[in-house]
Regions:
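Conserved acidic segment of CheY-like receiver
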Residues: 15-36, 68
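Conserved active-site segment of CheY-like receiver
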Residues: 22-23, 99-104, 124
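Receiver (REC) domain active-site loop signature in two-component systems and cognate sites
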Residues: 74-77
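Short, glycine/charged-rich "phosphate-handling" switch motifs in NTP-dependent
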Residues: 118
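C-terminal output helix
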Residues: 125-138, 145-146
């Protein structure tokens, strides 16, 4: 099931930075390649787990992303734990998060939406389908009118 809320549409014009929280280097390269193939040339920072993601977001020297792409299955702090942390932080809770995962578990999907994610996308196995998945994210993002407050 591919689900993205309208909230993702609100970030394109003023916050064009993406944070990818993903521990699998092949998936990182696939995300980078698919965004490039789609003409999305916004800065993309990558960290490998939820703890590193929190550290990145809380470091004032780093740019605030307009969108977080989040894997669920990671070491140290998984995606659901990361979501719980940022949704309690007034400075971070309004950043749209799209879960990009291989998990087809209904419990993971529900736990993600319980923590107010903007979207939940399954990582396709083949590259053309992956590009189509990233295109959905890009299309929602590119139709935005204003950034979240």
């Amino acid at each position: 099931m591919q689900t993205i809320s309208n909230e993702v549409q609100l970030i394109m014009r003023t916050q064009q930075h993406i944070l990818l929280i993903e521990d699998d280097e092949v998936d990182v390269m696939t995300v980078r390649r698919s965004l490039k193939d789609l003409g999305v040339d916004y800065p993309l920072d990558q960290v490998s787990d939820g703890e590193a993601g929190l550290a990145f977001l809380r470091d004032a020297a780093n740019p605030r992303p307009g969108l977080i792409l989040l894997d669920l299955n990671m070491p140290r702090m998984n995606g659901v734990e990361f979501l719980a942390e940022i949704k309690q932080d007034p400075k971070l809770k309004r950043i749209p998060v799209v879960v990009l995962t291989t998990s087809q578990e209904e419990s993971d999907r529900m736990a993600s939406f319980d923590r107010n994610v903007s979207g939940y996308m399954l990582k396709p196995v083949d590259y053309p389908q992956f590009v189509r998945t990233m295109q959905v994210i890009r299309d929602y993002w590119s139709t935005s009118e204003e950034a979240p407050n």
